[in-house]
Curated annotation (Swiss-Prot):
Top-level taxonomic group: Bacteria
Signal peptide location: none
EC numbers, comma separated: 3.1.11.6
Designated name of the protein: Exodeoxyribonuclease 7 small subunit
InterPro entries in the record: Exonuc_VII_S, Exonuc_VII_ssu_sf
Length: 84
């Protein structure tokens, strides 16, 4: 049942795999060794998911900084369709 996390997989795939592992563990019907393998896999997936979230936060901060540094232009009402 244990899968190796692919470092290139997206956040949603990582989260889905982690949720699946949590469900298996919560059921309580796995043998001890398999439960330990699933738990270990879950820890790896949680770390990978955390890395993905941190990368996304960094990208957002960079984009916000670029936006804050951009000069503001005066609003012109006729820039939108329907406004004349």
């Amino acid at each position: 049942m244990a899968r190796k996390p692919a470092s290139s997989q997206d956040f949603e795939t990582t989260l889905a795999q982690l949720e699946n592992i949590v469900t298996h563990l919560e059921n309580g019907d796995l043998p001890l060794e398999e439960a330990l393998k699933e738990f270990e896999q879950g820890v790896q997936l949680a770390k990978l998911g955390q890395e993905r979230l941190q990368q996304a936060e960094q990208r957002i901060q960079i984009l916000l900084q670029k936006t804050e540094d951009a000069p503001l232009n005066d609003y012109k009402g006729n820039d939108y369709e329907g406004n004349a």
